[in-house]
């Protein structure tokens, strides 16, 4: 995962939200913009739960990102957790990520 930077400021996140393409799944939303460098952000709002649940949701999303890092095109990503994420097993979340990855690859940029 060398060369990956995190999105830090509200301005950086807002840029990806407004200009990026949203890929929805029952467990998370992935915003993506093609870019020259790899930048990533993870978000879990209070709708997901209290701090412990939000942190767990972000860890699950980060594990997905690490697992698929080599297959993802370079760009800016924001993973937004949905409340259903914590109730699902990792295998189902993994299947959804595979579907989204295929949609990203099929899209013409």
From Swiss-Prot:
GO cellular component term, pick one: ribonuclease P complex
Keyword Disulfide bond: no
One Pfam family it belongs to: Ribonuclease_P
EC number in record: 3.1.26.5
GO term, biological process aspect, one: tRNA 5'-leader removal
The species this protein was found in: Nitratiruptor sp. (strain SB155-2)
Subunit structure: Consists of a catalytic RNA component (M1 or rnpB) and a protein subunit.
Its biological purpose: RNaseP catalyzes the removal of the 5'-leader sequence from pre-tRNA to produce the mature 5'-terminus. It can also cleave other RNA substrates such as 4.5S RNA. The protein component plays an auxiliary but essential role in vivo by binding to the 5'-leader sequence and broadening the substrate specificity of the ribozyme.
Keywords: Endonuclease, Hydrolase, Nuclease, RNA-binding, tRNA processing
UniProt cross-references to Gene3D superfamilies, sorted A to Z: 3.30.230.10
Domain of life: Bacteria
Alphabetical list of InterPro entries matching this protein: Ribosomal_Su5_D2-typ_SF (IPR020568), Ribsml_uS5_D2-typ_fold_subgr (IPR014721), RNase_P (IPR000100), RNase_P_CS (IPR020539)
Keyword RNA-binding in annotation: yes
MF annotations from Gene Ontology: 3'-tRNA processing endoribonuclease activity; ribonuclease P activity; tRNA binding
Catalytic activity: Endonucleolytic cleavage of RNA, removing 5'-extranucleotides from tRNA precursor
Protein name: Ribonuclease P protein component
Gene from which this protein is expressed: rnpA
Family assignment from sequence similarity: Belongs to the RnpA family.
């Amino acid at each position: 995962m060398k060369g990956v930077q995190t999105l830090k400021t509200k301005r950086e996140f807002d840029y990806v939200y407004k200009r990026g393409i949203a890929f929805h799944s029952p467990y998370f939303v992935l915003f993506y913009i093609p870019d020259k460098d790899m930048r990533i952000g993870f978000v879990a709002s209070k709708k997901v739960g209290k701090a412990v649940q939000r942190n767990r949701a972000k860890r699950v999303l980060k594990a997905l990102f690490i697992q698929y890092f080599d297959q993802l095109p370079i760009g800016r990503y924001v993973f937004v957790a949905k409340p259903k994420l914590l109730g699902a097993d990792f295998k189902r979340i993994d299947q959804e990520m595979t579907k989204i990855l295929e949609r990203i690859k099929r899209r013409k940029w």
